[in-house]
């Protein structure tokens, strides 16, 4: 932003305020409602979660996390190559005298760093050729700066600063590859610029390589494959909601059936922050006057809980009922009527 701001001042001069105003309006239009929501809940526009932030800001988190973030994109179907990548990253950390899994820079709930086998899953998808061509494009610009407009060099610096800022602020975790997507997309014009300055044969080979290596993730994608027994063309949309967590399918179908059979319209949820909820909205999409609320919330959003809400039933994944299979909420007794570990459905006694 700073780099493009300087460029705008140089180019537009007195008209820069018009461009600045347009930029501010676009920024507020895209992010304003999220900032307001976060501020109302956390008294901070960015809803800070210190568990995901590096313990301190400095060179060390950049040095370790940038390398690990980039290395994760070089996974391959061949264990020998993955072992080489892992070995290089380990030796690099030994050289800089930093623990590769230092808890100050690695999220505690993430598995330790390892360049294991390539996995065509939306949570772990990698982009090795994007990273490789981005690095080559940066090297090309470095050695040919005088041949091209300084604007493209600034653009490259912006993308590099995005990677460094990402590594500076966030603890490394194995699921970071999916969060790199904005930076990968931003690097596309730079890669195209580099290929445009290559021989035609290089461009053709590069395009073919990109396409060929994209096909396995399309056809054999774990979550939404085109072919195979889980093909998106041979499975219902309801089945596809549970491809990533198939053990949730039966309890969700069973609980939704109980709710519909007993005409239960007010449902409370007692679940963790990482638990699924949205498939239930899909299964009950045809229900009218349906209301579902989170209850017994223990985080910063607890103040938004509606104390007047008395659910007809409770979907419970967090609280252990008493010896009689009951819990109490707002002086009302709820009895377990269905259980499929870890899910329980509890109905108000008397209904």
Feature annotation, model-predicted:
Residues 81-156:
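Membrane-interface anchor segments at the N-terminal boundary of transmembrane helices
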Residues 271-306:
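Extracytoplasmic
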Residues 300-351:
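Aromatic/acidic, Gly/Pro-rich catalytic loop(s) in extracytoplasmic/lumenal soluble domains
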Residues 206-260, 273-278:
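Membrane-proximal, lumen/periplasm-facing interface regions of secretory-pathway glyco-
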Residues 2-5, 9, 16-28, 148-149, ...:
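Signature aromatic-anchored transmembrane alpha helix within multi-pass, membrane-resident enzymes
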Residues 31-95:
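Aromatic-rich transmembrane-lumenal/periplasmic boundary elements in polytopic membrane proteins
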Residues 4, 15-57, 183-184, 189-196:
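Repeat-solenoid scaffold signature
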Residues 1, 43, 130, 160-165, ...:
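Hydrophobic/aromatic-rich transmembrane helices and adjacent perimembrane loops
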């Amino acid at each position: 932003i700073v780099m493009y701001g300087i460029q705008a001042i140089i180019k537009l001069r007195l008209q820069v305020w018009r461009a600045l105003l347009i930029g501010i309006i676009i920024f507020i239009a895209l992010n304003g409602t999220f900032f307001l929501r976060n501020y109302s809940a956390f008294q901070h526009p960015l809803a800070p979660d210190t568990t995901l932030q590096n313990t301190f800001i400095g060179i060390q988190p950049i040095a370790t996390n940038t390398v690990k973030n980039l290395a994760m994109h070089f996974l391959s179907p061949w264990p020998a190559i993955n072992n080489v990548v892992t070995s290089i990253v380990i030796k690099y950390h030994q050289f800089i005298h930093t623990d590769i899994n230092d808890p100050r820079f690695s999220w505690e709930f993430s598995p330790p760093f390892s360049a294991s086998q390539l996995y065509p899953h939306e949570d772990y998808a990698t982009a090795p050729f994007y990273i490789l061509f981005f690095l080559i494009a940066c090297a090309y610009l470095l050695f040919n700066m005088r041949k091209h407009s300084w604007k493209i060099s600034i653009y490259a610096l912006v993308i590099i600063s995005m990677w460094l800022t990402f590594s500076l602020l966030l603890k490394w975790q194995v699921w970071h590859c999916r969060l790199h997507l904005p930076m990968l997309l931003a690097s596309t014009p730079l890669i195209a610029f580099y290929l445009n300055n290559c021989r035609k044969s290089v461009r053709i080979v590069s395009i073919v390589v990109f396409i060929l290596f994209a096909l396995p993730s399309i056809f054999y994608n774990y979550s939404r494959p085109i072919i195979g027994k889980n093909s998106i063309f041979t499975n219902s949309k309801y089945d596809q909601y549970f491809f990533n967590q198939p053990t949730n399918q039966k309890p969700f179908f069973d609980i939704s059936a109980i709710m519909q059979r007993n005409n239960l319209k007010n449902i409370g949820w007692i679940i963790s922050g990482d638990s699924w909820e949205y498939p239930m909205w899909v299964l009950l999409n045809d229900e009218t006057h349906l209301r579902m609320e989170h209850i017994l919330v223990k985080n910063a959003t607890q103040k938004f809980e509606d104390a007047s809400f008395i659910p007809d039933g409770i979907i419970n994944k967090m609280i252990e009922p008493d010896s009689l299979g009951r819990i109490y909420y707002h002086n009302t007794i709820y009895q377990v009527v269905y259980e499929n570990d870890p899910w329980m459905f509890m109905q108000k006694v008397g209904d």
